[in-house]
């Protein structure tokens, strides 16, 4: 990181070790005392802030326990935008505490506002059995944006990477859908993306396939290199995701609604079509 020029990065995404006492082949100590972990985090965060352009976006993915304290540190140097809660679906028994059901994604910017901010829109949530809306939009149906509903700060549609078709390593890895959403929101084709904890290369491959320039850091690069040499599966997944965003209804939902007599003519429906083509073009750049 010290070798990179200051003010060169448009978007920085960091998924650091969570300090959970895990064993890594690199022999990194993942069981630091709390203050030691926070001091280490502040050192890399300060260096990362140096790299950001004015208006650049800074994302940190971590446990709420750590992001609560790191957020306070970041707020003294950057402008807070969002705390995004990312739902996790594991249901492990925990005694004496509420069940922790989300990861935290901190979003800060360098300066008063981001230079790039165009979040994806999402389809209306529908019943998978009948196609009916899960929420009542009342008399506002004809006023809704045909490209979908606004993205909120609770993301419950980010799946864990379990399917072997997409999973690239035995250890945990981030969903490509998460990075697709982050990069779409805070970068453009040609933007410079940096990830200081590359892992299996999810940020790298997302940036590559979405037409961003990128650089990253990782001690053990074998998984990321193998993934970048064969991006067919990741490209297929991104193309699938492109058909499911920036539309008011997914095609399958529209078909199910028609089959079960649900009216869609009150909405300004834009399902796939030209929007689908635009998204595919973006992925293939």
Model-derived features: positions:
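PRPP-dependent phosphoribosyltransferase catalytic core
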Residues: 223-285
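Core catalytic lobe of class I
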Residues: 1-223, 272-285
């Amino acid at each position: 990181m010290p070798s990179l020029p200051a003010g060169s990065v448009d978007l920085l995404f960091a998924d650091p070790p969570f300090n959970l006492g895990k064993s890594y082949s690199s022999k990194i100590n993942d069981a630091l005392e709390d203050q030691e972990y926070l001091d280490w985090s502040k050192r890399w965060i300060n260096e990362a802030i140096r790299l950001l352009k004015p208006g650049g976006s800074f994302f940190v993915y971590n446990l709420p326990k750590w992001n609560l304290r790191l957020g306070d540190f970041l707020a003294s140097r950057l402008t807070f935008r969002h705390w995004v809660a990312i739902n996790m679906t594991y249901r492990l028994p925990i005694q004496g505490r509420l069940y922790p059901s989300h990861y935290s994604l901190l979003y800060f910017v360098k300066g008063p506002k981001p230079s790039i901010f165009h979040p994806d829109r999402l389809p209306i949530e529908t019943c998978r059995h009948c196609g009916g809306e899960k929420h009542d939009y009342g008399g506002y149906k004809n006023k809704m944006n045909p490209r979908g509903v606004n993205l909120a700060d609770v993301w419950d549609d980010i799946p864990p990477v379990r399917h072997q078709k997409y999973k690239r390593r035995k250890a945990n890895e981030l969903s490509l859908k998460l990075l697709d959403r982050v990069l779409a929101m805070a970068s453009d084709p040609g933007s410079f993306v940096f990830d200081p904890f590359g892992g299996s290369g999810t940020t790298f491959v997302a940036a590559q396939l979405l037409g961003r320039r990128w650089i990253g850091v990782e001690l053990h690069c074998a998984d990321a290199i193998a993934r970048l040499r064969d991006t067919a599966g990741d490209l297929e997944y991104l193309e699938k995701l492109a058909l499911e965003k920036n539309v008011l209804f997914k095609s399958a939902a529209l078909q199910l609604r028609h089959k079960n007599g649900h009216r869609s003519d009150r909405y300004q429906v834009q399902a796939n079509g030209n929007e689908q083509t635009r998204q595919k073009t973006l992925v293939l750049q």
